[in-house]
Amino acid sequence: MKKVNVVAIGGGTGLSSLLRGLKIEVGRSIGRLSAIVTVADSGGSTGRLRKIYNIPAPGDIRNCIVALSDAEELMQKLFQYRFKGDGLEGHAFGNLFLTALTDITGSFLKAIKETSKILKTKGDIIPSTYENVNLVAEFDDGKVIKGEEEITEYGKKGHKVVNIWLEPKNPKAPEEAIERIKEADLIIIGPGSLFTSILPNFLVPQIREAVKESRALKVFVVNVMTQPGETDNFTAWDHIDTFLKFSGIDLVDVAVVNTQMPSNGLLKKYLEQNQEPVTPDVGRIGREGITVYAENLIGESGDFVRHDPQKLTEVILKILENELLSKV
């Protein structure tokens, strides 16, 4: 099998799950793996550090570095460690580490590269912008809300997003991100929070235009569960349709959709939190000319239902073989 260049775009736990599976294929079917990650997060440890040090959000970057890490498990646990007690309470060690390295090197991009070396990542992590941006959304009642967490919370009141942008407007993307998109054979979008993890990347004009112009196969991985305040009652097609509407991207070639229901116990817990499995309306997606891969993709861990990294990777490999390599 020819080795291909893969670019994954997103943020949050969804992107981390995808990367955790894909890293095993680096050096096998994947020649180069690059993650382009949102830095618009404004909550928790990340939000506090952004306000104090005026840096892009380190949280999703940290999660992706750990997901791609080939370092000892202890190092991975260290970077995910959260402090308790007064002063540092809630801060992740990795966030503090990236913040300190940004100050030492004078560059957020350099800090990511040096941290990636220390954790021996099997791929490159690149922020979608190196600017300190904030996500802003206008809702159907005319209200304008700033900040990822705040947008999701306002959405829980039943309001729908009608417009979304970054401030400052037109932030610049790292040149490396544009180059990786241009050289990609496969671009994977998602999984992740639609409005607050995936779309912010495409609100960076250079990222959006590079993806639009790319001849790579574009794959959209649909979330397995709806998210309160963002995708309430969304079907699989609703996720794709909303992405296309707000991202400015013309099309996706392939959609990956989960067909498996969670176990009864976990399903009950999710329903109590106003979350439900995303309906796999495969026929509706197919009518748009999008090839659909619909399979059992979930993994259950504790109280969470997420994409299983191995199952998701197996589907991506199938897509590579059927949609890309067989047509070369």
Swiss-Prot record:
Superkingdom of source: Bacteria
MF (Gene Ontology): LPPG:FO 2-phospho-L-lactate transferase activity
Keywords: Cytoplasm
Localization annotation: Cytoplasm
Major subcellular site: cytoplasm
GO biological process, one term: regulation of cell shape
GO cellular component: cytoplasm
PANTHER family (UniProt xref): GLUCONEOGENESIS FACTOR-RELATED, UNCHARACTERIZED PROTEIN YVCK-RELATED
Function description: Required for morphogenesis under gluconeogenic growth conditions.
Family stated for the protein in its record: Belongs to the gluconeogenesis factor family.
Protein name per UniProt: Putative gluconeogenesis factor
Organism: Aquifex aeolicus (strain VF5)
